């Protein structure tokens, strides 16, 4: 891709997200979402092939459908209340319900999740990273603004369904991008679980999730790993990354005493304080499934070499020219922040 075109595209993606996050007017928020969506599509088809074109088409159809529902909700709210502000008190339950459906569709939450694994699988690792991290910021910022009017029961149902679908869907997958796509569905469910109770916990979970996912994608990009077969050659390509990738995967699964355990612990604590006991039990059970397929990846990295017909053509250690500047810092943050969790939680 032309560097100038790439600069314009990424600038528009960032600008669209910032317009949505900083806007209190519904039309500007919607326009920011559209700018972000239309500018992001070219990043999905950097490599022109049938799979990337299919992924971009699925992304466009899902996002445009959600945008239409959101615009319908915005117009309905204006007709009913006469206001265009995002923080208005909603007198009718229909606009916030339609907004919730539209924004959860944009986030890829169940039952509107079908596009997430397919789009993630059909894109390069860098585009998949942006899809599962940066592209969540704008919809979540809108949900943050309207959270007092969101129906708590509906959001809890959608979040629980997302956790279950993401955990079950990740089983028996061999494509790493699909596994991370299903993992994203699960983590989005965890994020949204406490939005109506305590949005600060949602923010904490979002920051932790973005850090862990960025670390994982950058590590996979460094090794050029997209399947469990290529992942099994990690010990040959980057021996020093084996324990670091292992700890990142365990943190992504929420295993103590790693960083990923902190937001899960706080989320469960918040739900139990609000007398929700069945939902945290389901969440913990589903997290065990998540941890299972992360452990399967760890087993692949550290202990085995998958059956292949060309074992003699191994990829040996060559000098890696890809930038590794941020990976050590990100891995440190991804694994070692739990001891300072009281300090993190004390920040208002």
Swiss-Prot record:
Where would you find the membrane-spanning parts of this chain? Answer: 13-33, 60-80, 96-116, 124-144, 150-170, 200-220, 241-261, 278-298, 325-345
Q: What is its main location?
A: mitochondrion
Gene Ontology CC terms:
mitochondrial inner membrane
Decide whether keyword Electron transport is in the record: yes
User: Sorted alphabetically, which keywords does the UniProt record give?
Assistant: Electron transport, Membrane, Mitochondrion, Mitochondrion inner membrane, NAD, Respiratory chain, Translocase, Transmembrane, Transmembrane helix, Transport, Ubiquinone
Q: Where in the cell is it found?
A: Mitochondrion inner membrane
Q: What is its EC number?
A: 7.1.1.2
Tell me one GO molecular function of this protein.
NADH dehydrogenase (ubiquinone) activity
Question: Which superkingdom?
Answer: Eukaryota
Which reaction is this enzyme known to catalyze?
Answer: a ubiquinone + NADH + 5 H(+)(in) = a ubiquinol + NAD(+) + 4 H(+)(out)
Topology within the bilayer: Multi-pass membrane protein
Q: List the disulfide bonds.
A: none
State the coiled-coil residue ranges.
Answer: none
KW Acetylation (keyword) present: no
According to its UniProt entry, the protein's GO biological process terms are:
mitochondrial electron transport, NADH to ubiquinone; mitochondrial respiratory chain complex I assembly
Q: What class of enzyme is it?
A: translocase
Family of the protein in this entry: Belongs to the complex I subunit 2 family.
Q: What does this protein do?
A: Core subunit of the mitochondrial membrane respiratory chain NADH dehydrogenase (Complex I) which catalyzes electron transfer from NADH through the respiratory chain, using ubiquinone as an electron acceptor. Essential for the catalytic activity and assembly of complex I.
PANTHER family attached here? Answer: NADH-UBIQUINONE OXIDOREDUCTASE CHAIN 2
Assembly and interactions? Core subunit of respiratory chain NADH dehydrogenase (Complex I) which is composed of 45 different subunits. Interacts with TMEM242.
Q: What's the protein name?
A: NADH-ubiquinone oxidoreductase chain 2
Task: Report the gene name.
Answer: MT-ND2
